[in-house]
Amino acid sequence: MNEQKTNDLILQTATKLVSFIILLFSFYLFLSGHNAPGGGFVGGLITSSSIVLLLLAYDLKTVRSLLPVNFIYVAGAGLLLAVLTGVGSFVFGAPFLTHTFGYFQLPILGKTELATATIFDLGVYLVVVGITMTIIQTIGEEE
């Protein structure tokens, strides 16, 4: 039986643009998460959905060449970052996962709030992206 080669030029071209927009939205949700709905979990899921869109438009081999990352290591790094953020409060004699924040004057952004909760959210973000992509790639692999 001959396999018919499909022409997915429109899907692949649209995916490049849409994936970028989805990643920007994911970044926005990640940064607004401590003041509004969003954060590391939702941002990570949306980032994973962007990568899944790439997997649908292209194939697993192409996406792996674009993102040569072992996602299980991404999840491990995120878990380590989240735990270290929580343990870091012990250094200051505070309970586990006690967070603090401060306002800093940054060159282009002006007065900006920087919080340790953002570092914890980054850990959650990495764990969610790592685990969801590991599961999806494992399911999508050929035997």
Curated annotation (Swiss-Prot):
Top-level taxon of the source organism: Bacteria
Main subcellular location: membrane
Keyword DNA damage: no
One BP annotation, GO: proton transmembrane transport
A GO cellular-component term linked to this record: plasma membrane
Membrane topology: Multi-pass membrane protein
InterPro entries per UniProt: CPA3_antiporter_subunitB, CPA3_sub_B, MnhB
Keywords attached to this entry: Antiport, Cell membrane, Hydrogen ion transport, Ion transport, Membrane, Sodium, Sodium transport, Transmembrane, Transmembrane helix, Transport
Compartments reported by the entry: Cell membrane
Family stated for the protein in its record: Belongs to the CPA3 antiporters (TC 2.A.63) subunit B family.
Subunit structure of this chain's protein: Forms a heterooligomeric complex that consists of seven subunits: MrpA, MrpB, MrpC, MrpD, MrpE, MrpF and MrpG.
Function: Mrp complex is a Na(+)/H(+) antiporter that is considered to be the major Na(+) excretion system in B.subtilis. Has a major role in Na(+) resistance and a minor role in Na(+)- and K(+)-dependent pH homeostasis as compared to TetB. MrpA may be the actual Na(+)/H(+) antiporter, although the six other Mrp proteins are all required for Na(+)/H(+) antiport activity and Na(+) resistance. MrpA is required for initiation of sporulation when external Na(+) concentration increases. Also transports Li(+) but not K(+), Ca(2+) or Mg(2+).
More about this protein: Mrp-dependent antiport apparently occurs by a secondary, proton motive force-dependent mechanism, but the similarity of several Mrp proteins to membrane-embedded subunits of energy-coupled NADH dehydrogenase complexes raises the possibility that there is a capacity for electron transport that could provide a primary energy coupling option for Mrp functions.
UniProt name for this protein: Na(+)/H(+) antiporter subunit B
